Amino acid sequence: LVKLLQYLDRQEPQQRWGDYLKDGAPNWGRIALAGQSQGAGMAAFIAQRHEVARVILFSSPWDFTLTDGNVRQLARWVSAPGKTPPERWYGGYHERENMAGLIAEAYAALRIPPDHIRVFRDDLPPAQQQTGKRNPFHGQGVRNPIYDQDRAFFLGRSP
C-alpha cells in the first residue's frame, strides 16, 4: 500500500496521494476500507488493528475454526477489542447466502451498530436464477442494482 501511494503521488501529485501517508506508513485515519467476501474479511482485520476512517463489509467476515463437535466458531480476532470505533463500521449480507448466520454473529462480535447493518432479502435477478452456483446470494449486496441505496448509505455518512 505504501509503495502504491508513493507511486500515485509521483504520477499524480495534484491528487495529493501522499496525504494518505504519514511518516512513511499508511495514514489509516484518512483511509476508508471496503470489501466483499475475503476482501471484507481483510478490511475488518485491518480495521481491528488500525483506526480507519470507515470500514464497509459485504458478506464477511466469517473466519472460523471448527470445535471438537464440528461446530463453526468465529475466529478470535473477530471479537477482540478493535481500534476503529463501532460508529465507523457498516456491513451488509443477504439472508439466504450460505454463511448468513455466521456473518450476523461476526457483525455483532465486531459491535457494528444495528442501524449500520443491511440484511438484503430480495430474490435473485431473473438472469441469475438458473446459474447453478452453490452460493448464488453471496455477492448480491455489491452487484444487484436493487441495493444501490444501501450502498449509498454505507458511503454517505462521515464518522
Regions found by a protein language model. Name each.
Residues 22-25, 77-83, 158-159:
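Surface-exposed acidic, glycine-flexible loop patches that form ligand/cofactor-binding
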Residues 53-145:
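The feature captures the conserved acid-bearing segment of alpha/beta-hydrolase catalytic domains
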Residues 42-46, 105-106:
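A short acidic, amphipathic alpha-helical/loop segment
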Residues 1-25:
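Alpha/beta-hydrolase active-site loop
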Residues 32-39, 43:
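Gly/Ala-rich beta-loop-alpha elbow adjacent to hydrolase catalytic centers
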Residues 45-54:
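Conserved hydrolase catalytic core segment
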Residues 112-114, 148-158:
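Long, compositionally biased intrinsically disordered regions
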Residues 23, 27-31, 58-62:
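Surface-exposed cleft-lining segments at the edges of enzyme active sites
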